[in-house]
Amino acid sequence: MRPDHVNLCCLCATILSPTAILFGQDALDKSALITKNPNSIVCTFLEDCTMENFSPALLSHARQDDPLYIIGNTHNWFVSNLHPSTNEERFLKEKGDLSIQDFRFLSFTDCSSSTEDSPSILYHKNGQLFLRNNGNMSFYRNHSEGSGGALSTDALFLQHNYLFTNFEENSSAKNGGAIQAQTLSLSRNVSSLSFSRNRANLNGGAICCQNLICSGNVNPLFFTNNSALNGGAICCINEQNLSEKGCLSLAYNQETLFSGNSAKEKGGAIYTKHMVLRHNGPVSFVNNSAKLGGAIAIQSGGSLSIIAGGGSVLFQNNSCHFSDQGTVRNAIYLEKNALLSSLEARHGDILFFDPIVQEVVSPEFSTTSALTPLRIQTNTNRAVIFSSENLSKEEKTEANLISKIQQPIELQSGCLVLKDRVILSAPSLSQAPQALLVMDVGTSLTTSSDLKLTTLSIPLHSIDTENSVSIQSPTLSIQKIFLSNSEHENFYENVELLSKDQKDIPLLSLPKGLPHPDLPDGNLSSHFGYQGDWNFSWQTSDQRETLVANWTANSYIPHPERQSALVANTLWNTYSDMQAVQSMINTTAQGGAYLFGTWGSAVSNLFYSHGNSGKSTDNWKHRSLGYLFGISTHSLDDHSFCLAAGQLFGKSSDSFVTSADTTSYIAAIQTQIATSLIKISAQACYNESIHELKTKYRSFSKEGFGAWHSVAVSGEIGASIPIVSNGSGLFSSFSIFSKLQGFSGKQDGFEESRGEARAFADSSFTNISLPVGIAFEKKSQKTRNYYHFLGAYIQDLKRCVESGPVTLLKNSVTWDAPMANLDSRAWMFRLTNQRALHRFQTLVNMSYMLRGQSYSYSLDLGTTYRF
């Protein structure tokens, strides 16, 4: 019978089978039903159960040869404080399979064996143990004087569990602080798996087995703070020297973390003979330690293969404790004749912030021709990286920097990177034409025989005036050397190095007498920052020959992230806001008559511009929202007067990295005089603003911040000729109007207070324009509604723009960031509706302005109380 059919059939079997047995007076009591079928024994839980002693009936059936299925039926099973002194009290199954499944919560807590060499609380051999389809599983603070603090079995399959699985603080006097097995499968679990603070006196702080397959788990795996003699978290070794044993496979898991594990001897996180790590999500080995192999130790004659298929593989701050060298950084230790088969970075990087150490091979493998090469392959934009960038200056000793590989290295494709003073030693290294070797200045590559390089890249950002790339080899061939400049490194922003001419900058050091590679090309690709020319030559000393570079500085081109014209263009934002304010105030001269009124209105304005230079840095948008309030009067003769004040809160941003917050304080006055033939109106407005600039750099480390002040005034004077129709159409009257508008704004210069600090000069903007248009209106006495529509063509008569230079304070370099010169022609449309409600009058005002490189919208909602 299949295990997944057992749960469905157990109740029927109870009724129909003559061999059905009910146990009522033991630890299970009425919580479970045990049935014996021809080929299996089934224990089905009928309710939650808590035990401090195993059911005698359950123990009796466990000792039979038939497979035993313990089915939770989505109930809970808690076992705690169980301390058996004899095998009769222990859950011991010596033949047949055992399956514990379908529990909502399965817990074994504070259970222990009290006699020496006694097995685990759950001990199973000569069969398979299944823990599957459970929700939460917890094995906490269990102990065994034998092997397997919580579980001991020949074959364990921990599969298809779906909430959380936790092995914590279990311990063993021998092997496997939590689990001891010959074969172990942790596969296809939806639940996250955590092994934390488990310990074993011998091997495998959390797990000890001969074969481990960990694959297809869709939530993270955590191995943290476990400890043992060998294999702080996992020990998977060949104790019987059988070639098919001692294999560990981590594959297709979502995320895996080994952190804080320790071993007194070998393998801070893992000690195994054969290991394959492939096609996982992110895998991290962090802060693990051992005498040999801070993170991973490979047994003599074994092998290790790492394929970063779904995320990066990281080794960081792992350490080993040599008696003669103290504590040094170490990621991987390969014992005698153990091989590092491949490093493949496909969809993630392989990052070694700790070195690799490989023992010297035995004499029969001492010739490079007999050794299997280490194959390095990476996809585009991925790399195998050796780096010491996370070490302090004091920690950068040779023992913490050097990776010793005893196999030939074949760089078959992609990119191998040596960074920040690391040293790579190997018998030989060969490079395929499509592969790239990247070496920072200060790094070293040493081979005892042939070194054949097709392309060597030296990153410009690593250059200083003292160190060089060092290569030591009896025979050397380099076809091409070039200097690489990553757009993210900003090498050409280096003030100390590039602001003046430099002589004899060391790049590459070779043993004397080796043939010189061709000189790098001095015509580098276009870039921002300091501009200049490179020249290269070889210099010879007593024992070395050095490739040196000479730099001749010419000019400076600022990075686009520094060039934003948003500060100067803020005056355009102020201009647009004041146009919106004037539009709102003009509505007080329209509508029904009243002796005196007080009013308030919400004001909003949206302004978009794409400049006229074609640069994305000149595109910007501005949004403002605020309020106006005032007093006004509007006579029957259409004379009007208004005083207003208000505040606007604005947000501006370009299409790159710069934004500005604005707080504006506004005061305005408006008047209108009307006769039967003509209406004359005038308006003046004053604006004082405080601006705060924020630059969230993508290419520089610090955020920029600055603040400045601006003042602006605007005004208009206009005349309109009203023409009254018969009132039967859509509008009752229309008028032809013309205005003369003026705006003048000035903002102070300022310096940014942090980040890539810049100084901005004063700027000013003056504009005189002539709107000409036609307006339509309709008054409805029945509904007390008033409608007004206006359309106008605007021609700018005179414009004066003054914007000073921007200065980068760290090098005093200046450049222009001119204010946008938008089109001098514009179209403006406005629609207003007012409705009288006894003493209250509501207002809706919408306007739209279209200019050659910009457009704006405004919307006002207000009310007037009429006395």
From Swiss-Prot:
NCBIfam families found in the cross-reference section: POMP_repeat
Residue intervals of the Autotransporter domain: 591-867
Subcellular location: Secreted, Cell wall; Cell outer membrane
Signal sequence extent: 1-29
Organism superkingdom: Bacteria
Keyword Signal among UniProt keywords: yes
UniProt xrefs under Pfam families: Chlam_PMP, ChlamPMP_M
Entry membrane topology: Peripheral membrane protein
Alphabetically ordered keywords of this record: Cell outer membrane, Cell wall, Membrane, Secreted, Signal, Transmembrane, Transmembrane beta strand
Coiled coil: none
Protein name: Probable outer membrane protein PmpI
InterPro entries according to UniProt: Autotransporte_beta (IPR005546), Autotransporte_beta_dom_sf (IPR036709), Polymorphic_membr_middle (IPR011427), POMP_repeat (IPR003368)
Protein species of origin: Chlamydia muridarum (strain MoPn / Nigg)
Gene Ontology terms: cellular component: cell outer membrane; extracellular region
Family named by the database record: Belongs to the PMP outer membrane protein family.
